[in-house]
Amino acid sequence: MSRQMWLDTSALLEAISEYVVRCNGDTFSGLTTGDFNALSNMFTQLSVSSAGYVSDPRVPLQTMSNMFVSFITSTDRCGYMLRKTWFNSDTKPTVSDDFITTYIRPRLQVPMSDTVRQLNNLSLQPSAKPKLYERQNAIMKGLDIPYSEPIEPCKLFRSVAGQTGNIPMMGILATPPAQQQPFFVAERRRILFGIRSNAAIPAGAYQFVVPAWASVLSVTGAYVYFTNSFFGTIIAGVTATATAADAATTFTVPTDANNLPVQTDSRLSFSLGGGNINLELGVAKTGFCVAIEGEFTILANRSQAYYTLNSITQTPTSIDDFDVSDFLTTFLSQLRACGQYEIFSDAMDQLTNSLITNYMDPPAIPAGLAFTSPWFRFSERARTILALQNVDLNIRKLIVRHLWVITSLIAVFGRYYRPN
């Protein structure tokens, strides 16, 4: 398949996508038999078995998009599409002109070979996308759902290297401890921390490190009390018993210098961000567990997992990505939502390296090549490739053009990608 055919076919896909979006979904007309054949031939060469727009016009291009993304991230990614021969040929494409003449040329008035390189055209999006400066964007994100709605602490808990997951801790906490063991866990509406022990723990000061997942939380209207249950299971090695004569137990958090009481009817509101919880145990106990029960929300100015709002204090900067980033936004959101962001990024890094390798003679990665930007920052990657002084300039230009077409195709297909 020639470069020209790829360019014309992707322009055809964009026209189809707009046409389907604008129609009511009950009918799908306007494509000639030649158009169907051209698309079928293209996907046959990519080993893509079926095209979604033929079988179900209500989900235009979704199946096709999923298969294309699967192809990009599969073991075939270093195959036919990445070879020099695929991009060297300018043979006459076999795409029918009927649909292109009807739906594309009157709007664009540009040669088909330039369509994908001009992403500001109306066939990509039916309406103009508003431009947001980084400051405005950050402020809008700060008002977004993660900050304004309650969240369950157990949904934030993440199992990391050297740390047992939240639910597996239930069985561990139900097992009598061999020695003193501090713990910090979460369940619905509650965060629990303390020390398990078979022997008495003397009264005094104890410090608990707030893990990263909890450091982004604040709590309002919280009761703080001693307990011995976790997800309905009894915690072994702690006691919740007390008498009226017991000395008070208090604690402090980094964001509040006041001593906050434990085991009272007081309703407390505080932030868990910033470091450690310092507990002053008023009376000796054979192990103890403190529960914080209240309404938890994400800290807008602390959550590294969502948005840091750092851009509010930065000057707006423009990134020259030829507007391709705008059209990849939907795709990137889908990847993040289904946990495939890192997988796809790794695949694109391998794809880019394989593409460059195929242009070298003998095939190899050029010395000094190292990408510091993510795959969707096309202009930065192009700058890195064009800076390879030990590679012929014409070869560098071909690599960038080849990568641009692949990125453009991802922008076309990615808008309809759904993980399931």
Curated annotation (Swiss-Prot):
Keywords noted in UniProt = Capsid protein, Host cytoplasm, Host-virus interaction, Outer capsid protein, Virion
- Could you identify this protein by its name? Outer capsid protein P8
Q: Which family does it belong to?
A: Belongs to the phytoreovirus outer capsid protein P8 family.
Q: Subunit arrangement?
A: Homotrimer. Homomultimer. Interacts with host peroxisomal glycolate oxidase (GOX). This interaction mediates its relocation to virus factories peripheral to host peroxisomes.
Q: Does the keyword Disulfide bond apply?
A: no
Q: Which GO terms describe its molecular function?
A: host cell surface receptor binding; structural molecule activity
Q: Among its keywords, does the record have NADP?
A: no
Task: List GO BP terms, alphabetically.
Answer: fusion of virus membrane with host plasma membrane; symbiont entry into host cell
